[in-house]
Amino acid sequence: MKVSLNVTNYSWPDGPTQLASRLISLAAAAEDGGLDTIWVNDHLLQADPGAGPGERDMLEAYDTLSFLAGTTTRIGLGAMVSAISYRAPALLIKAVTTLDVLSGGRAWLGVGAGYPGEAERLALPLPPTGQRFDLLADTLALARHMWTGQPGPFTGKRLTVPDPQGVPGPVRRGGVPVLVGGAGERRTLRLVAEYADACNLFDIPDEGVTLRHKLDVLREHCDDVGRDYAAIEKTVSTRLGAEETADQFAGRCARLAGWGLSHAVVITPGPWTARRLATLTSAARLVADA
């Protein structure tokens, strides 16, 4: 199983002036420790319901990922996940393509339909749910159109692009790998089957009942659209407990793998600390050796 970290909280105790050095140290330790990808939340406001009143620092996702690209050489880089209506589709595709080019082919495009709270507070665009899913499908189709060099205009259900050029293209042939976040059975998992290289589900504490069910639904969608289910990376967002040991977390990864997951994307209460990151990298080595 692959193991990655997700940065959801930037409120380290030494404040914003040290954020750059904190991120450099975090990225170096993650890369040296063998983690697969650094994910960052694509939020403008703190979205962790467990964050304290003083933990409000949040950085823009693609600026942060571009900064991390310049301080690392191997580890993957992605947003977990971008609300589809916050950026114009062509701009989002250009941003992730630029990240892929400048990182030497290490970017992920992580996208989802978005949710109301943050958009309402910051007056961000948030069309009705059905329109957002249409826009998500159009954006994924547009990315494929641009990354494969298809000629001519693009016309989707909600989106028309007269001249969808994307030069330079991504480093990897076929484009940047796509992760669609969310577990909605009718539309989200259908879009995974149609367009994505990975899904992202949530680690519900019910002994795998929900996760196995969601994967069964994804398999049905794959069968319906003629997609190879095995070709989709099954990621799961899960939390490393404050006192959890490497052995304990590796055991949880083994259970997740037994339920059909292949990639653990790990968050932690509060900002990442050196101790918690060391626990995670130790667990990643145990999982790799299993």
Give names to the regions the model predicted.
Residues 128, 132, 136-144, 208-218, ...:
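C-terminal helical cap(s) of enzyme catalytic domains, especially alpha/beta-barrels
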Residues 1-15, 74, 115-121, 157-176, ...:
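N-terminal small/glycine-rich loop or linker at the start of catalytic domains
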Residues 3-7, 38-40, 76-79, 107-111, ...:
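Hydrophobic faces of well-ordered beta-strands that scaffold small-molecule active sites
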Residues 2-18, 84-153, 202, 271:
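Flexible, glycine-rich active-site loops centered on histidine and acidic residues
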Residues 30, 34, 42, 68, ...:
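Conserved, mostly hydrophobic/aromatic
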Residues 7-21, 80-90, 173-184, 236-247:
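Active-site mouth loops of central-metabolism enzymes
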Residues 17-30, 92-95, 181-194, 244-257:
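Short, acidic/polar
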Residues 1-71, 174-176, 205, 274, ...:
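N-terminal beta1-alpha1-beta2 module of alpha/beta enzyme domains
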